[in-house]
Every structure is written in C-alpha cells, then in structure tokens.
Amino acid sequence: MTTEIKVERGLFDEVMVPCYNPMEMIPVRGKGSRIWDQDDNEYIDFAGGIAVSCLGHCHPVMVDALTEQGNKLWHLSNVMTNEPALRLAKKLTEVSFAERVFFANSGAEANEAALKLARRYAADVHGPEKSEIIAFKQGFHGRTFFTVTVGGQAAYSDGFGPKPGDVTHLPYNDIEALQAHMSDRTCAVMMEPLQGEGGIVPPTPEFAQAVRELCDKHNALLIFDEVQTGNGRTGHFYAYQGLGITPDILSTAKSLGGGFPIGAMLTTAKLAEHLKVGTHGSTYGGNPLACAVAEAVVNEVTKPEVLAGVLEREALFRAGLEKINAKYNLFSEVRGKGLLLGAALNEEWQGRARDVLVAAGKQGLLVLVAGANVVRFTPSLVITQQEIEEGLAKLDKAIATLV
C-alpha cells in the first residue's frame, strides 16, 4: 500500500530542476477550453498548453482513440512497425507535400531530424563543404544542442560551451541580407512560417517567395519549422499552404498529438533515401498510443468546418482585442494568423507582457507571452464563442487592474 503524497506548489521547488517557474495554482482537470485547479477554481484557457491543445482538453475523439489503443498495444520500438503509425504517416502524406515521414517525440526531435537530413543530403550529393545552415534572429527551433544553436536567441543557447558550427543567423524578413550572404556553401535555410517565440512575426509574401527562390538558386533545402504553426493553427493544415511556397522538409509536433507527445519530420521520397537504416532513429518514435491519438486529431482538424472555423474565431479575437484596446490603449498591433495571435504592447507598456499574464491568471484566464512585449494567444481551434467572450471579459478586467 502506497502513502498518498500531498501535492502543493511548494513540492515543485523541492523535487524539480528549477528551469521552470510555474504558476502557483495546480490544474487537476480540464474540459474543452476550461480547466479547474485543486480548489475547483475555473479558468478559461487561451494558452492551449503553448499551441498544443488544438481540440481543447479531453476531446472525446482523443479520449476514445487513446482508450481503444491502450487496450491493444502500447509500445514496440522500431524493430517492428505498427498500424497506427502507418495510418498516421499515410494521412500526413495525403494532407501535405510530403511522401515520407519520420516520427519522433517532440518538436525539437523533429527539427533535429530535419537538420541531420539536410546535412546528410548535402554531404552525399554535393560534398562536405556544403554544410552551412542559415536561420533567423529571434527564431526558435527547440532545446537540443543543435536546435537551440540554430534558433536565433542567444539567451537560450549561450552558457553551454562550444556550439555546433556553420550556423548563420540573419534578420527575418530581410531579403537583401539573405541575398548577400547565401552561397553555394549553404546547405539549408530553416525558418518558421510565422515566428512564434520571437514575437508572432509573419513573413512578408515577398520574403517567403525570395527564400524559396534563393534556396533553388543555390541548391539549398528549405526547412519549415511548423511545430507551432501546423495542424490547423493558421486556418490551413500547414501554414506553408497559405504562403504559396512549398518546403523540402517540414517539422511538426505540438498540436499534432493534441496534448499527447509526438513529433514528425515530413519530406520527399528523394530526400528520405539519404537517411538509410542506422543513420537516425528513435526508440519511442511512432509509438502506437501517440500515433493513434494523433490520427484522431488529424482526422478531426482536417474537417473543412474546423479549418474554416479557425478564421471565424480569429475574427472574434481580433474584434474583442480591438474593443479592449479602445478602452486602455496598450496594444500597438495584433499580429499573427488564425489562432496564433500576438498583441504587441505599445511604447508605454514595453516590458509588461508578463504583468498582463499574471493579472489574467488572477482573473481566471490563461494567456502566454512571446517575449517581454507581446501577449500571445494560442487557444483550442474549436474554442466556443462563449468561451472566447468570457475570456476576453476576464482579460478586460485583468488589464483594468494594471492601468
């Protein structure tokens, strides 16, 4: 018989590595876009676990898929394949440019696989001197040593000793800088089709087109990090589908599993041939439980009414934020696409995004930040109009306590 451990926020400080600073409250259950803490206080969720809970909490199709698979088969490793993994891979090739899929456990792992594939392909086809990876300042691609180096934020990558080499960071949306630097040594360009952690910054159509054209000119691969933008978040299943260009490699995770950990790298048959047996792998990648849940998520999100509903909900958010801004004048603009939105604070409110987050939490609303100057919203793709209106009313009250 085990002794029940009393779980309070203070236990975090006793037993957890202090690389996080979680809120004081501890959620214990959720339904739709609402969660409840240990004291049964209710919160509206505009954070979605950082763009993960695309169908909200405990959506029936996800619960049913997990329960059904949980009674069949949990794990095999890639010594064998499994039905959920193959069905999901087939589905992902049907809804994207991809012909081949590699499964991982997270966005960082999917990006690691993407970068390794790009380097491997360049070495095999063009020789070892073609190894430069270009990424963009304020980008974010994960926390592994390779991906955090490729991400363009020194605050995350400094302090761990020598970094992987031949990585160059250029300004996002700067065509001239990219033209001036890119060469036949460039192996790949890695970019987010909408910068998330960097402040919810969309690419200009001209920049996106120029990146694709320059990659073609220099025989470099274009890698799209769609960990945050993918799986319906922008109103397209993948954000590239709204930009008029197609990457060579794409990474996806976060909302792919709707809250169950899974990541994937998508690419073409031609490129995939360069990751032969033994060149890369993952013990848990393609796990039957994860793939069964993700298959249910993809089937739900790809419904036309769900994707169309994302843009309808975006309009509700923008209208509500505009109304709040008319009262308090704290936002300079609302950026983003679909349900990946960032309210940029104006000059008087610079550095106070976390203040808004904390104040919102006290009013029963969960939001995010994207840097010190942007309040970020990444709710469920199926959040109801009532939940949006309730949440915006709570945000209004929260801001009123700060002015």
Curated annotation (Swiss-Prot):
Annotated SUPFAM superfamilies: PLP-dependent transferases
Localization (cell): Cytoplasm
Predominant location: cytoplasm
Sorted UniProt keywords: Amino-acid biosynthesis, Aminotransferase, Arginine biosynthesis, Cytoplasm, Pyridoxal phosphate, Transferase
Signal peptide coordinates: none
Any one GO MF annotation of this record: identical protein binding
Record carries keyword Transcription: no
Enzyme class: transferase
EC number from the UniProt entry: 2.6.1.11
Binding site for pyridoxal 5'-phosphate: 107-108, 140, 225-228, 283
Keyword Electron transport on entry: no
Subunit field text: Homodimer.
Miscellaneous note of the record: May also have succinyldiaminopimelate aminotransferase activity, thus carrying out the corresponding step in lysine biosynthesis.
Classification via NCBIfam families: arg_catab_astC, argD, PRK01278.1, PRK05093.1
Protein name, per record: Acetylornithine aminotransferase
Originating species: Vibrio parahaemolyticus serotype O3:K6 (strain RIMD 2210633)
Gene field: argD
